[in-house]
């Protein structure tokens, strides 16, 4: 099969997403990409969203982290930026640790909830971060 899978498969996935989450189904031709696992997906996503033409591209990763985050960032031409997650903060990513100058260069943020390997569940803090960005 082709890398993108068959049209019937992508249509089926798009329909399931719409039914499962009660949202408009994504466009199967441009917004659905079947993958063989998370590793392939994370690499493909970084290759898609990191703009190599922009200087100083950065990708934010939790630390400790799934090593694929780092490899995908580097392969996409970006510099990984690590946010330490530690016990005294409940293993939460401390978003305020990133200076505004770094945020301006961030092109991708890898987040896993529940976190691996910490088990931290991200709730409303991620929505607040997303809404604060241009």
Describe the residue ranges of each PLM region:
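Phosphate-binding glycine-rich loop
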Residues: 10-58
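Conserved beta-strand segments of alpha/beta enzyme cores
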Residues: 31, 79-81
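Substrate-binding/gating loop at the entrance of the active-site cleft, primarily
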Residues: 36-40, 44-47, 61-79, 87
């Amino acid at each position: 099969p082709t890398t993108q899978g068959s049209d019937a498969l992508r249509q089926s996935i798009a329909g399931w997403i719409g039914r499962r989450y009660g949202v408009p189904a994504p466009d199967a031709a441009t917004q659905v990409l079947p993958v063989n696992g998370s590793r392939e997906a994370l690499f493909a996503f970084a290759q898609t969203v990191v703009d190599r033409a922009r200087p100083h591209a950065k990708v934010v990763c939790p630390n400790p982290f799934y090593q694929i985050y780092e490899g995908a960032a580097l392969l996409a031409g970006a510099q990984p930026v690590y946010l330490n997650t530690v016990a005294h903060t409940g293993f939460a990513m401390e978003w305020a640790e990133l200076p505004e100058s770094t945020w301006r260069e961030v092109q991708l943020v890898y987040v896993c909830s529940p976190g691996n390997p910490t088990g931290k569940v991200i709730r409303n803090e991620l929505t607040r971060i997303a809404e604060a960005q241009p």
